[in-house]
A protein has these predicted regions:
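N-terminal juxtadomain amphipathic helix
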Residues: 2-94, 256
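A short glycine-rich, Lys/Arg-flanked "PGG" loop and its adjoining helix->strand segment in the class I
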Residues: 191-208
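Extended interfacial segments that mediate partner engagement and assembly in macromolecular machines
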Residues: 51-151, 163, 229, 234, ...
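Short, glycine-/aromatic-enriched active-site segment of Class I SAM-dependent methyltransferases
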Residues: 38-41, 211-234, 238-242
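Hydrophobic, well-ordered beta-alpha structural blocks that scaffold small-molecule cofactor pockets
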Residues: 105-106, 130, 267-404
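A conserved beta-strand element that flanks and buttresses the S-adenosyl-L-methionine
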Residues: 179
Length: 404
């Protein structure tokens, strides 16, 4: 038994040293953070539960061969994606507009009318619902966090949801489009996952494959530490994502940066196309420079934010963050914030009355601020500053408003 265990551990260690995207052995560690919450979007019912939230280790490595960035200490067994996972961003009018416009663009660009759409990581089904409505399509959504009660009755005849993780049992589903948004970054073995997507495409050779996920270049250049957390074990640029698709047997039809350059969208089909990089793809060397910049500037960025919060506390100011999702969790845990900030504001009503994992701030509705009257509001995504400012103004509140 001991010999077998040692052998298994050795195999696992060797696998951990290989890039999950291209399998090269050119991983270079550049950033680590110990004891961070293993989930950012799970609903936590009490402050005690929040403070005792399970934690894991983060050690980011950059692949000098393909540009992919991975958490080499990621342990998927620590996570549990279920109906207690609340990732919905659609309660923001700004995000909802972007999502609906993207759905409309894909439906029209790829002629998805009266077609079959399979969405991997469909969440609560909002995006799949939009694609089905816009093109009179039939959709199958796959996600362990799907909540049946959140699907309106009028959509049930044209949509089916499977509350499970995507796997080999799904590659035979008929599909004219295979959609995957904000899911690949949660998967450690990205090469293995793309082999499943390749199998699905081989079973549906005319299907278009449509992906959306965060862009790591902005994270590195802006030293956006709030966008680094345990759930995101895989980080892509447009170049590293396109290289993974080509290596997986896909022709990349297009790629672009969206949503204030925060997200990558990529469209592909089965087959070997040109190996010439698209204009939006950066070379690996340029990404290596961005990694170096992040590494050099990280400590200074953390110190600057800690100083700002300390000054607010010394002045007796009331400070809240706006955005109780992953960015908010990472912002608070990275800075070690506890009593300096008592509340996290969020527009998602399903989060109200819950608590932030690891740091324990209570999550409140925007209306709570009428009585609390904060002096400083820190928006966890600057793209929402106008939206947040308008809500504060509607409540006759005039705090300082900062964006990360």
């Amino acid at each position: 038994m001991h010999t077998r265990a040692t052998s298994t551990a050795a195999v696992a260690a060797e696998a951990a040293r290989a890039c999950p995207s291209c399998r090269s052995r050119r991983l270079e560690a550049f950033h680590e953070h110990r004891g961070i919450p293993v989930h950012s979007c799970r609903l936590v019912s009490t402050a005690d539960e929040a403070l005792a939230f399970p934690r894991g280790e983060l050690s980011l490595s950059f692949c000098a061969n393909c540009g992919f960035i991975t958490n080499t200490e990621y342990d998927g067994s620590l996570q549990d994606y279920s109906v207690a996972y609340e990732e919905t961003q659609g309660f923001s009018a700004r995000f909802r507009q972007f999502s609906e416009e993207l759905a409309a663009r894909w439906v029209e660009e790829f002629g998805l009318h009266g077609k079959r759409i399979v969405e991997i990581g469909a969440g609560k089904g909002e995006f799949l619902t939009a694609m089905c409505e816009l093109g009179d399509n039939f959709g199958v959504g796959i996600d362990p966090s799907f909540v049946e009660e959140r699907l309106a009755d009028e959509h049930r005849s044209r949509m089916q949801f499977l509350r499970e993780l995507y796997g080999e049992q799904h590659v035979g589903l008929p599909a004219d489009a295979i959609v995957c948004r904000h899911t690949l970054e949660h998967i450690h073995d990205v090469g293995g996952f793309m082999r499943l997507v390749r199998q699905a495409a081989e079973n549906n050779p005319t299907a278009v494959v449509l992906f959306e996920l965060p862009d790591v270049v902005r994270v590195l250049r802006d030293v956006a530490f709030w966008d680094i957390y345990y759930e995101h074990c895989s980080y892509f640029s447009t170049g590293s994502l396109a290289r993974l698709f080509r290596d997986s047997g896909f022709e990349v039809l297009g790629a672009r940066l969206e949503y204030d350059d925060q997200y990558i969208t990529l469209e592909a089909r089965l087959g070997q196309g040109s190996d010439t990089p698209l204009a939006v793809e950066e070379p690996v060397g340029a990404l290596a420079d961005d990694v170096a910049l992040f590494r050099q500037s990280y400590a200074e960025t953390i110190e600057r934010w800690r100083d700002q919060l300390a000054e607010a506390a010394a002045a007796g100011e009331r400070v809240v963050i706006w955005g109780a999702g992953s960015k908010g969790v990472s912002f608070l845990t990275t800075l070690g914030v506890t009593v300096e900030i008592a509340f996290a504001v969020d527009v998602n009503p399903y989060k109200h009355g819950k608590y932030m994992p690891a740091t324990g701030q209570r999550i409140v509705a925007p209306e709570f601020l009428r009585e609390y009257k904060p002096d400083l509001v820190i928006a966890m995504n600057s793209i929402y500053l106008d939206e947040i400012g308008a809500q504060l103004e509607s409540m006759d509140l005039q705090p300082r408003l900062l964006g990360v």
